[in-house]
Amino acid sequence: MSKSTEYIEVYGAREHNLKNINVKIPRNELVVITGLSGSGKSSLAFDTIFAEGQRRYIETFSAYARQFLGGLERPDVDKIEGLSPVIAIEQKTTNKNPRSTVGTVTELYDYLRLLYARVSDAYSQTTGKKLVSYTEDQILDAIKENYKNEKIMLMAPVVRSRKGHYHELFVQMAKKGYGQARIDGELTDIEYDLKLDRYKTHDIDIVIDRWIIGESASEARMEKSLRTAMDMGEGLIGIQKLGSTEIEYFSKNLMDAETGHSLALPEPNTFSFNSPKGSCQSCKGLGTIKKINTDYFVENPKLSINQGGLLPLEDIKSNKYILSQIKNILEIFGLGLATPFKDIPEEALDYIYHGCNKEFNKDLKYAGISKKIKINFDGLIPFMEELIEERESYEAILLERHFTTEETCPECKGARLQPSSLSFKIDGKNIAEVNGLSLSDLKEWLADVKDKFSEKNSIIAHEILKEIETRLQFLLDVGLDYLSLSRSSKTLSGGESQRIRLATQIGSQLVNVLYILDEPSIGLHQRDNERLINSLKNLRDIGNSVLVVEHDKDMIMEADEVLDIGPRAGKFGGEILWQGKPKDLLNADTITADYITGKRKIAIPEVRREGNGKSIVLKGATGNNLKNVNLEIPLGKLVVVTGISGSGKSSLINGTLYPILNKHFYRAVQEPLPYKKVEGLDNIDKIVDVDQTPIGRTPRSNPATYTGMFTDIRNLFSELPESKIRGYKPGRFSFNVKGGRCETCQGGGLKVIEMNFLPDVYVHCETCNGKRFNRETLEVRYKGKSISDVLDMTIDEAVDFFQPIPKIFARVKTLQDVGLGYITMGQQSTTLSGGEAQRIKLATELAKRQTGNTLYILDEPTTGLHFEDVKILMDAINKLVELGNSFIIIEHNMDVIKLADHIIDVGPEGGKYGGEIIAKGTPEEIIKSKKSLTGKYLKKEM
């Protein structure tokens, strides 16, 4: 290999905050890029190297194909040499599609379907007996053998347990010359006027021929009649001895000889929940159905229906007919639309919700007569169900969003497949049962089942099993043994979906590729981290270059080469501070090196907080893998929940406790996982879940609008003398309202180019040059800065700029306090990472007036944070705890765990081997626990 191709050489990289840097990255090695959050790590790895790799790939397409992709912009870099094909494995949650599962993403389910299509056995749904299939020759031989010298009838089963009068069928059969049929066990002549009871279920077998085996029946006649019967019965025939009521069935398909129940031979799509051939008819292969929940119908029972008390009516536009029917129902009970909801009796509500078809006599006392009231109303719930099923209007979407809950499909019990697909089994398990096994159990089952195959099936299954086992092992190697193939992709964390993609890439066995990963250690316990590092080394050892953006100490120390970018974030970063082998970090003069060598550290508190003596107690939590857990959260403390990936931390906190609290305080829709009872809810006055979901989904949303300070900034600009002269109000300085904004881009600063089947592309508006406002608005300046200049400021600059204005200053200061000084005020929320979005939410909470009695829940807040940023974040959190608030943090980061006042360790392992609280107490108590794996790693840290 020549010298020039031993490195990926980047010259003059200026993307985002990069300061025209040159860097040589060794190929076929594991290289870690580290540095403070916002220092430019992702700008180098993803926005420069990956973007250029992707652009070069698209350049290879034909001009015709490129017109649909649009010109991918060349990153701001002079040149990059020695670049291999690039694959980026990012943290983004893979798929919000409810049909996507771990099995479909990894393609393991496709191989499993193939395995079941080729080597499974079918069993009868009624008798449980194994189904058999025959060839035509075997059927003929069996008939000759079993019915020697007997008089028999050959029949074609055409209807099996179905309702209908079947008049057309009998007319058709009579025209073809067939004279008799066995209908519901009775032999009947076929007449042109024959009609059955249409509301009863029937079995109909057409008599095709009569034989005396060995005498009247010639070989040629038997073969011809048998073929006719087979065609008519779709592979199934029946044989009945004359004078007997018993019938014996034979099938080319799989069949139960007792009942005649028949199944087609399986194909891979027999087991696909995305194909009509395999999916459950009721839920269409989703495993869940949406059910209307009346608990969400009424928020304030003191209001009447006239005052908007019955919420679904607010979402239904054409509600005049419904209102008239409800009015009639209430009139029967002597009530009206002005009656408070709490005074409406249960019987009346039953009529309103589920319908009524009756006539009532209503006495009109004042007139001394009675009045007839006829009610013919299907009910509010059936009306809503019909609207939701059609999904043709926006109101249907609103009704589904506001008034339904997701329930397991009662037909398939969540298996997603038809009963016939679940009749096929290998070693007693159907495909849905195997799909529901944890990956570690699946490995055991495959090893066990291999030895039980017949010689023929062993040969057929050999290659399929090899593929399944190889891919499965890669998933186990990246610490995902607790997941099952049936787990829905939308429930995976960013870290889990990234590791699934990593395992899929390792499974593809590509070589000479540059892999770029974004913090693969997210969501991993220290123990699983070691397995992940080995997987990355494996990827390197087969002949690939691996570039990892990472803050994890173990990952940095295990790398072949480390790049440290800094020195600070935003415009104060973007330089290569140090590059070399991890062992030489001792001599480096950077913040990262100081934390790794121990010169800087996050100090362990001298005393742990006592809390306020109150607590929230959750009893009997059994959701997912939880084993009847009793959880006590002491209040007024920093509580950290730890445990192996998949041990049940999220099920306990995000799946059970948070939905209970959210329902109690805010009447939220999400149902908690099963539990027995909860105590102590009155010990807090509100609950805040600071998660990593985006703060906005369009480029119009930004930190200034989310925190609410943009309103104050607009008010400030409207109070300036220039604005007063021109008559500008605060709305003039909004980019969402006509008047002050640029009308070409409607205040977006960007124009959206729709790409039909591809994601939309955003380009700068040529009229305002991305400034969002028109020329007149930009002429109004405060301290020499226009409203657009203010949005372009970093938070650090805004802190100095707005010092004289307390209201705005307080809000920008909290953003600076959580370590976000490097982002700009108007940065599009779509470009913020999950960790940044989470800290903006935290800053917004910090800026609010404190009641000192709030419970905050954070899930892995250190995602994307450097050691120094973790310190800043924990200082901000501790400020809130000092004010009397309580925190529950789910975290694997030892720097956070060691600061806890109280630790709850869930385990001992992931999946079915987890789901218990194995240790609780202060960090000092946890490190003494023999059971706690977290304690073992925490001991090293402390």
Descriptions of predicted regions:
Residues 1-942:
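Conserved phosphate-binding elements of NTP-dependent enzyme cores
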